[in-house]
C-alpha cells in the first residue's frame, strides 16, 4: 500500500500554473494524477463544492489557471473542455446544514473525499490545494495549488462553475439576496439583505454575519440531511466521447471518515 507522503509547500515563488507537478509525478511512475480543489468556504450561503479531475496528458487544455483569475465566460468554456477531454472528473457538494454541524474545514474535506472517491478508475496520485486527505494514496498538498498545478486549476474551474450554477438557481428562489451576483459571499448588499430580511434556511447559521442578523432564529428551520448522502456529479470517462455522454449528476456517494 502506498505511503501517504503529503507535503505542504508554502513558497511564494513558482506559482505560475503549469504541468510541472504532473510531470514530476509521472517521472516517479504515477499515471492517474488527480487534481482536487474546493470552492465556497467563505460564503455565507449554500454548499461548499469540491471537484477532482484526472487530465489526459495527451489532450492539452490551453488556459488552465486559478478559477478566480478567469472571467465567467472563460471558466464556462474551460469547464466544458475539461468535461470533454479529461480522463475522469467528479464534483461533490456539502450543504449548509452539514457545514453548520461539522465546521467548514471538515465539510470541505468531506467534499474532496467524496469527489476523489468517485474517480474511476481510481487515482494513484493526488495534487491537492492546501489540504491533506486521510487516504492511502500518494499525495502532495500545494499552497496556492490552483495557481500552480494545471490539474488543481482544472478542479477549481469545475467546482467554481458548478457552484455558480447552483447560486443562479438559488437566486430564483431568493432574489432579494443577490446571489447571482455575490455568490453568497459577504458583500455589502448581501449583508444589508440579511439585516432587512433575515437569513434563509440555506444560509450558514454557524457564520457570524448570519448568526447575528435579525430574526435568524425564526428562519433557522433547515434540518440536516442524512450524513451518509452527498450529492455527486461524476464522469468516469475513458475517452472524450464517453466523457461527453456519461455525466450522471445527482448520484450519491458515501461519507468517507
Regions found by a protein language model. Name each.
Residues 1-257:
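RNase H-like, Mg2+-dependent phosphodiesterase core
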